[in-house]
């Protein structure tokens, strides 16, 4: 069976396309074009999942004026299956984030933030299983260390835990206890850094049981997914599609009998007319 995974990251309240003004991204992005592209893919493909990798908000006057509500309403309308938390999602404080998440028709997935003593208590899940055409796809989410990115006033009593350790624990539950055929991490750690800071690449190298990492934070435009060997020598696929909704990531995965999966095509599509 064929399964199509679509994903965005770091959309940053970009509801409109970039203006036609001679700049680098002119005419690209915009929710209407993204929604049309997603709708077209859903009419062509039977098994589609749509994820976001954080930083839904912050970056345009829409957010300054309306506080994130339109962004969440648009994601609801596009029927996102899940998102994870980015640092900028805390910019107006954790109470406001909780208010926005209560509007969402999609789960917010994160396994390495302890939110029990915050307004976000009960508004996130560590992982989620999606069943499509008899196939179990397990998804967990990880977030970046928020220290230095947002203040403790904005995050409240959020407690950060190591994303590699928590991620491996979540992946093990999904793969071995819940018997998922495919395990995906939606991450807001960042693709990679010059310094030895936890990133998607470092997480992949230290991982077990995860097949695909969909990333965000570093606004990295990957033309094709990166393949990294995990600690057992198996390949983990990493993908990220820049920022601002300029691209829509697409991974088409074919599952063969016997549990082997192979990526038949990986297309990071430009969102344009």
Task: Report each predicted region and the residues it spans.
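Acidic, metal/ion-coordinating pockets
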Residues: 1-272
């Amino acid at each position: 069976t064929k399964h199509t995974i679509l994903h965005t990251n770091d959309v940053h309240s970009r509801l409109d396309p970039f203006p036609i003004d001679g700049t680098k991204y002119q005419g690209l992005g915009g929710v209407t074009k993204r929604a049309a592209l997603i709708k077209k893919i859903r009419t062509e493909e039977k098994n589609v999942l749509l994820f976001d990798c954080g930083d839904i908000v912050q970056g345009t006057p829409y957010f300054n004026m309306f506080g994130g509500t339109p962004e969440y309403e648009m994601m609801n309308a596009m029927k996102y299956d899940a998102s994870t938390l980015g640092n900028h999602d805390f910019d107006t404080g954790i109470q406001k984030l909780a208010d926005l998440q209560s509007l969402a028709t999609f789960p917010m997935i994160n396994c390495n933030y302890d939110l029990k003593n915050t307004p976000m208590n009960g508004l996130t899940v560590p992982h989620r299983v999606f069943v499509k055409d008899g196939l179990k796809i397990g998804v967990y989410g990880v977030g970046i260390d928020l220290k230095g990115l947002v203040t403790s006033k904005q995050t409240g009593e959020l407690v950060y835990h190591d994303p590699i350790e928590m991620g491996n624990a979540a992946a093990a539950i999904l793969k071995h206890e819940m018997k998922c055929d495919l395990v995906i991490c939606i991450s807001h750690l960042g693709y990679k850094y010059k310094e030895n800071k936890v990133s998607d690449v470092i997480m992949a190298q230290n991982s077990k049981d995860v097949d695909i990492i969909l990333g965000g934070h570093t606004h990295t435009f990957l033309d094709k997914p990166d393949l990294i060997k995990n600690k057992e020598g198996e390949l983990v696929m990493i993908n990220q599609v820049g920022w601002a909704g300029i691209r829509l990531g697409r991974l088409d995965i074919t599952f063969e009998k016997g549990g082997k999966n192979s990526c038949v095509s990986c297309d990071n599509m430009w969102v344009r007319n």
